[in-house]
Each structure stands twice: as C-alpha cells, then as structure tokens.
C-alpha cells in the first residue's frame, strides 16, 4: 500500500508573478510527488473556484494562504493513511470535505495541487513514469499517442496589451512525422515570425503565453502575417501546417453582440459565426476555440451547423471541463471538441471523466495549459496517457511553456513507436 504519511502545501509564484498553490504528498518508503495549480486569465464563469485571500495589502489580494492552510489542515487530516494509488477515492474524499458545487470551501487550486501530487507520488511508488500511471487510472494501460501541438505564436485579447481582439493565433504542424519534428517546425515558424514582424517595424514583445503581441489593423492581418512567416520558414500552409484560433469570444461579448473593438466591428451571434467561416475560406484554419460566448447556446448551434462538419469547434469556456455541461453539449450537438483544463474542474479523476465522455461521444480532446503557469509539466503526461491527440501549451518561448514541450520530447524518446504522432488525423473534420 502506498500509504500517505504527510501532505504539505505552500504558496509559490506563477508565470505572471501571482501566487499559486503547490503541494507535496509523501508516502511510506520515501516516495514523494509534488505538483502546482495553474491559473487562467480568460476564465469561464462556471469554472471551479480558485480560492484567493482577498487581502489587498498582500499580492493585491491574490495571495493563496487560505488554500495552503486548507491543504495543511483539512485535506491533510482527511487523507493521512490513505492509499495514494486509489486516486478516485482520494479525490472523492476531498470533494466531500469541500461539500460545495464548485469547490469554494477548500478551493479548486488546493484540491487540484494535492490530486496531482498524489498521482505523482503513486507513480513513484509503482516505479513507473507519470504517463503510465495516468493511463492505468484511465483504464487504457499501454495505449499512448503523441499530441499535435497548438502553438500560440501571436497573442491578443486578455493575453496581451494590444489591439488584437482574437486571443490566440496558433499553428499546428500536422505534416510532421514525429512530435520532435513538429516542435522543430513550430520553433522555426516562431523565429521566422519574429523576423517578419521586425521587417514591418512591429513589436516583438510577447504576451502571457510567449506569442508575439503586435498592434495590427485587423484580426485577418494576423493570419496574413503568419502565412508569410510559415512560408518564410520553408513550409506550406494547409499541408505542412494548419492554423487554429482561440477567439475567447466571451471576453468581447457585450449586450448580445460581439464587439471587435480593435477593428471597429460589431456582429450578431450568427454574423460573427459567418465572419469566422469567411476566415476559414481564406486561410487553412482547422480549429476554432470558443468562437462564441459561453452562454450563447443558440449561436453555438448555428456555428456548429455551418462549420462543424469541416472545422474543429472547441468548447473551453463553453464546457469548462465539466461533464454535466459537456453532456448537455453532446445531447444538443453543440461543438465537436473539448478543451481540457485541470483547474476548471479541480481534480484528476474528474478531468479523466470529462476526457472519456468526450471521446465516447466522438468529440476530439485538446489538453491545455493556463495563461498563468508554472514549471509543472503534468499536462504533457496527461496528453500522452489519454491519447488525447492534441495539446495547447503556448509558444516556443518562456520556460513555463517550453517545460511541457521538453517533457513531451522525453516521453517520445522513452516510448518510441509505442506513441505514434498522427498529425492531421487527430483534428476533427480534417482526417
């Protein structure tokens, strides 16, 4: 038995200079797991609660000492002596101790940090890599694939201080034969984009996720510049590389309309979907995330109707990694893909349940970071362990992003042909 003998919580810093929660789970025999909770900027209103202290005299109210206290007190007391390999039991105990719908007593950040740390401790106890242990928990032992990365090379919206409304413009190296090759392609395009921006006298400062954040005349201009950068790097758009957008449309949804203030345009729900469809006809965009507000279900139905057979439509704020909300989407034919973020739901067990539900319904799965990240690379192992097929973890810049890519390189090296890179086949509507 992987008996838990101690749990330690602490306050650490995330990639935006804000506090976040880290936890250690210690087992008999000297085994230990450590994990940190990430934090989002554009957040869905139905996400599990990230517990902050609210003390304006300390970290502008963003301290997490209450969450840390919950780890060192209530959570530690509840889990002492339990078996770390019994992940579902541990997570359920924490959920029961919390006793609220959205984890606002203990904090999803506290529960998640302990949940992931316990999984890492259990993997250490079993003497296996984390991805192997997660695959066991998922009921898919030995079944792996390497994810196609969504690389956020140009930032707007809440992730950058510029006038670009769409939050993320991403490249997916679908023509690569391996993850290692995909990473190289993305890095070359990233550096190519920097030189293109410089040649136009545009800013090469970066946003929260490491993508460039220039002021541009329109959102379409961002796509045009990326096209130039892809070709300058020696690749063909549409075959070697496809494009992906994260609109984060909830951030510019006002009074029932979509306000692209950066270019002075206002759209109805159907009008904005038509606008996005027109972009897919001009550029090889294979995936669009949060193309409408999280509450605009009628708009989502229209968007899915006009694009869902050819374009991957990813629900992030729409589904918030929540099986109850995802089931409603599946039942109503809304979107065709889900973005998976640990901290939206708050435990590993609930995360795996959302992945299984999506896959069983024929939805694709994209494992994702948050804009406020740490060096914790657990999402890399999760993507491989569940054969998710896609991962979204930022640009080829900033070590909080690159840490995940580097972990994927290590995993691919270990697994070799046991973890194929399937390219375009992983993206809904593109196979």
UniProtKB/Swiss-Prot annotation:
Residue numbers binding (2R)-2-phosphoglycerate: 167, 341, 370-371, 392
Record-annotated active site: 209, 341
Matching CDD domains: enolase
GO MF annotations, alphabetized: magnesium ion binding; phosphopyruvate hydratase activity
Subunit: Component of the RNA degradosome, a multiprotein complex involved in RNA processing and mRNA degradation.
Cofactor detail note: Binds a second Mg(2+) ion via substrate during catalysis.
Locations listed in the record: Cytoplasm; Secreted; Cell surface
E.C. no: 4.2.1.11
Annotated HAMAP family: Enolase (MF_00318)
Name the UniProt record assigns to this protein: Enolase
